[in-house]
Curated annotation (Swiss-Prot):
This is Large ribosomal subunit protein bL27. GO terms for cellular component: cytosolic large ribosomal subunit. The gene is rpmA. Belongs to the bacterial ribosomal protein bL27 family. GO terms for molecular function: structural constituent of ribosome. InterPro entries: Ribosomal_bL27 (IPR001684), Ribosomal_bL27_CS (IPR018261). Residues 1-22 are annotated as: Disordered. SUPFAM superfamilies: Ribosomal L27 protein-like. GO terms for biological process: translation.
């Protein structure tokens, strides 16, 4: 009899998509109120001036303006200013 034996089953074969975390708006970019600036798990970047932090630690803009990343006290802060800020201490 020319039968093929039953093939074994596998427990592999799935791959979840990435969570799409990271920076969404760069330093100096224009944003509107409510725009997501940085998606993260934990507080890698902290909310600065005119920026808020969501339940999932997402940093978002509270006003319409320009994004500015600042380094203060060994932390990186994402702020939003109504006018463009010229500062050499940007950290990204």
């Amino acid at each position: 009899m020319a039968h093929t034996k039953a093939g074994g089953s596998t427990r592999n074969g799935r791959d979840s998509r990435g969570q799409r975390l990271g920076i969404k708006l760069g330093d100096g970019q224009f944003c509107t109120a409510g725009s997501i600036i940085f998606r993260q798990r934990g507080t890698k970047i902290f909310p600065g001036v005119n920026a808020g932090r969501g339940n999932d630690d997402t940093i978002y803009a509270l006003i319409t303006g320009y994004v500015k990343f600042e380094r203060r006290r060994n932390r990186v802060y994402a702020s939003v200013y109504p006018t463009r800020v010229q500062n050499s201490t940007s950290a990204e």
